[in-house]
């Protein structure tokens, strides 16, 4: 039976998850067991271990393996302007509406959070769009973009702002030449855009902080949390959504992944902005 399989996966993975919690403080117990089994299984094969018990012994006696396992579990696949339709809507409808309302209210602060930002492509994409919009409107605004992730290595890469061609292939040529400089086969984001994004380590299941500590108080105008909820069971999805809800200012925007939606406890607190895209407004 499926439930028996799930229970067995939880049983055999628990010692490994407990060890990760003990050594690094990351709680993966709310992640989907099947996903964890697949990703940990990749390291089991790579280390030639015959089962999860043997792999745990390897993990406990090979310090470098811990980082390799975390890399596999928190795998970060992203690129600039990933999901072109979503970013077209952000550029053409969402950001202009937010900025125009800010200008009308004489509110010169714009606060954005990119949760699970990986190597920074998503928040940097937003920084580029905001720069272009403010330049077009001839408007000045204090822009605060916060990118968070649980992967230290990914955040270190984000801080370097140096990307291979595969990461920037979705960027229009005009924006690429304007906001990046070529370095060999890679592209480096210019300092004026890079400085707009603040990166920090943050676990969405952190029980101590409802919002990223670096952001101080949340109250975001715009939050992106794409393709993160799909990794969690419903109990942990509710925990994450509670944070997202609390972090958003009234009438602000939340963007989820294509296969994601507000959890049952929070559906009535959000209205869909676009029928064909997972863009929601807090009500």
Name what the model sees in each region.
Residues 2-113, 257:
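Conserved AdoMet
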Residues 107-120, 125, 144-146:
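Conserved class I S-adenosyl-L-methionine
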Residues 119-138:
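Conserved SAM-binding loop of SAM-dependent methyltransferases across substrates and taxa
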Residues 115, 136-224, 228-232, 236, ...:
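Extended basic-aromatic, gly/pro-enriched interface segments that bind polyanionic ligands
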Residues 238-250:
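A short glycine-rich, Lys/Arg-flanked "PGG" loop and its adjoining helix->strand segment in the class I
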Residues 250-258:
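Conserved beta-strand signature within the Rossmann-like core of class I S-adenosyl-L-methionine
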Residues 222, 264-283:
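Core SAM-dependent methyltransferase catalytic element
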């Amino acid at each position: 039976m499926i439930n028996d399989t799930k229970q067995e996966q939880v049983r055999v993975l628990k010692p490994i998850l407990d060890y990760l919690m003990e050594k690094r403080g990351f709680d993966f117990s709310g992640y989907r067991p099947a996903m964890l089994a697949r990703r940990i299984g990749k390291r089991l094969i790579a280390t030639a271990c015959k089962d999860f018990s043997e792999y745990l012994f390897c993990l406990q006696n090979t310090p470098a393996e811990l980082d390799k396992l975390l890399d596999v579990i928190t795998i970060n696949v992203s690129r600039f302007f990933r999901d072109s339709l979503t970013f077209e809507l952000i550029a053409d409808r969402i950001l202009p509406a937010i900025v125009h309302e800010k200008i009308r209210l004489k509110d010169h602060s714009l606060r954005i959070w990119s949760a699970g930002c990986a190597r920074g492509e998503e928040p940097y994409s937003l920084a580029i769009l905001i720069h272009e919009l403010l330049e077009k409107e001839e408007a000045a605004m204090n822009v605060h973009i916060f990118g968070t992730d649980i992967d230290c290595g990914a955040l270190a890469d984000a801080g370097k702002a140096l990307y291979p061609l595969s990461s920037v292939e979705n960027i229009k040529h005009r924006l690429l030449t304007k906001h990046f400089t070529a370095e060999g086969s890679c592209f480096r984001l210019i300092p004026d855009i890079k400085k707009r994004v603040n990166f920090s380590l943050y676990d969405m299941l952190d029980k101590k902080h409802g919002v990223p500590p670096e952001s101080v108080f949340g109250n975001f105008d715009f939050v992106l949390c794409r393709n993160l909820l799909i990794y969690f069971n419903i109990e942990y999805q509710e925990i994450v959504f509670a944070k997202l809800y609390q972090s958003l200012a009234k009438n602000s925007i939340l963007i989820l992944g294509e296969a994601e939606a507000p959890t049952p406890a929070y559906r009535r607190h959000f209205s869909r902005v676009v029928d064909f895209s997972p863009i929601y407004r807090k009500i």
